[in-house]
Amino acid sequence: MKVVAITGKRECELVDRPDPRIKGNYVRVKILVAPMCTEFHQYRDGNPGDCLGHEAAGEVVETAGPARVNVGDRVVVMPQNGCGKCRLCLAGEHIHCQTPIDPLAICGTPTGRATYAQYCIQQDWLLVPIPEDLSYDHAAMACCGLGPTFNAMELMGVDRFDTVLISGLGPVGLGGAVNALFRGARVIGIEANAYRAALARSIGVAAVIDPNDPDARAQIMDLTGGLGADKSVETSSAQAAPALLAEATRPKGHLASVGWGGPIAASRIVGRGLTIHGAWHWNHFLHTDRMMHTIRGTKSMLDRTITHQFPMSRV
């Protein structure tokens, strides 16, 4: 099969690798859509390798035996590999599994872990069925495009009465805006990139603040009647972002971190009575119907946030 390999700084090519083998509860999936996530850092920095991509949507083409899915099923491929046996996995929180398994150890195949490829393998319980009325493009957003911030909205209980502040309006932050807007919330963004800011405004974000502006916090306070945002989500991983959100979230408000940025002083958390949430991915045991309902209701916004589409042959 063909897979994408990074060969140098801003250089990549298609290379031939063996088709992945499956065993046990593993399933082989033909990749039809693979969103771009953090892999661009590796491309930009020139870190060589051919294990790229951790999310996808595609079609089941082979099972090793009786499985929860069938050949021909359309599925979203969940990221990571939980053990499937621990308390977290059994509760649908496989992303936090402390004893993840290595597909290589189970299937004996060096390929199949990456999604920038023609095929990948995944355990059957980590494949989410795609409803007939959703396209592969839209369904693929159930991973990092919408998933982490969907979890943040669930944890914080975002609704139409909230003003939600989102720091970082890249692919994950824009997904946060889509999630919050679908729930009827008013959204304020923090973003320095003009293209991303304009894209956010085009889907309904009320205002976008430049984090490099020394008056950024004051502008947020002005937009929230001097109180601060009801709920905040950090997606940028910028070192200063969590502290800014802690200052710009109202007392007794909620702050969810999707990004892996800098610290928040305990005095800010306690003094403002903030509830802090860590949000990495969504619970597909509990919330699959809600996730698909969100995708179904935000197709027009997703069509804007899916800015570019390329065949793998153009890599």
Give the predicted meaning of each segment.
Residues 19-34, 44-90, 131-133:
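Glycine-rich beta-strand-centered segment in the early N-terminal region that forms part
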Residues 35, 64, 237, 259-260, ...:
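Short glycine-/small-residue-rich Rossmann-like dinucleotide-binding loops
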Residues 42, 83-167:
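NAD(P)H dinucleotide-binding glycine-rich loop of Rossmann-like/cofactor-binding domains
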Residues 125, 132-213:
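Mid-domain Rossmann-like dinucleotide-binding core that forms the NAD(H)/NADP(H) cofactor-binding site
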Residues 156-160, 198-275:
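Glycine-rich cofactor phosphate-binding loops and adjacent beta1-alpha1 units
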Residues 263-309:
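C-terminal substrate-binding/catalytic core of Rossmann-like NAD(P)-dependent dehydrogenases/reductases
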